[in-house]
């Protein structure tokens, strides 16, 4: 297929009824620095982000753009924050799933994964070179791989 053929065939998509196609934002963060324990991210020195980022605020931004739902992606290494997000998502349908934070290779990993995986909104985990972790080093550990 030639580029012009492809472009002419897809040009009408932009003109189609956008409301008939649900738009899901695949990466948002939820956090509330006013919680008693605060948040590990963003830092207090971040004047733009250091304010509650909760579904109501997100809905006000997203709905006028035609966004109908969002997947929350972890922004905390605290295990309890997985449940905090699930509790918020249970109360607001704009959150259609979450990608949590757990550490494969840790003794409690499987217990936590089984617990959170029971909730259909918990879609998986994100693990990378975040929170002082080193994915390259972890990949050489059998317990990390077996989890």
Where are these regions (language model features)?
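Generic detector of well-ordered alpha-helical packing
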Residues: 26-28, 75, 82
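Active-site gating/metal-coordination segments in enzymes
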Residues: 79-147
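Glycine-rich, phosphate-binding/catalytic loops in enzymes
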Residues: 40-43, 87-89
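N-terminal secretory signal peptides and thylakoid transit peptides that target proteins
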Residues: 1-11
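Divalent metal-dependent hydrolysis catalytic cores, especially in the metallo-beta-lactamase
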Residues: 43-51, 56-79, 95-103, 123-130
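Residue-level preference for short coil/turn positions at secondary-structure junctions
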Residues: 19-20, 66, 94, 118
């Amino acid at each position: 297929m030639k580029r012009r053929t492809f472009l002419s065939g897809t040009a009408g998509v932009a003109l189609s009824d956008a409301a008939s196609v649900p738009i899901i934002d695949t990466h948002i963060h939820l956090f509330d620095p006013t919680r008693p324990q605060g948040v590990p991210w963003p830092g207090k020195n971040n004047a733009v982000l250091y304010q509650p980022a909760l579904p109501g605020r997100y809905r006000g931004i997203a709905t006028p753009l035609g966004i109908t739902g969002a997947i929350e992606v972890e922004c905390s290494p605290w295990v309890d924050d997985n449940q905090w997000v699930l509790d918020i998502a249970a109360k607001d349908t704009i959150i259609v799933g979450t990608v949590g934070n757990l550490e494969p290779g840790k003794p409690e990993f499987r217990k936590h994964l089984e617990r959170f995986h029971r909730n259909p909104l918990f879609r998986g985990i994100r693990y990378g070179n975040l929170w002082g972790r080193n994915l390259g080093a972890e990949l050489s550990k059998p317990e990390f791989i077996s989890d």
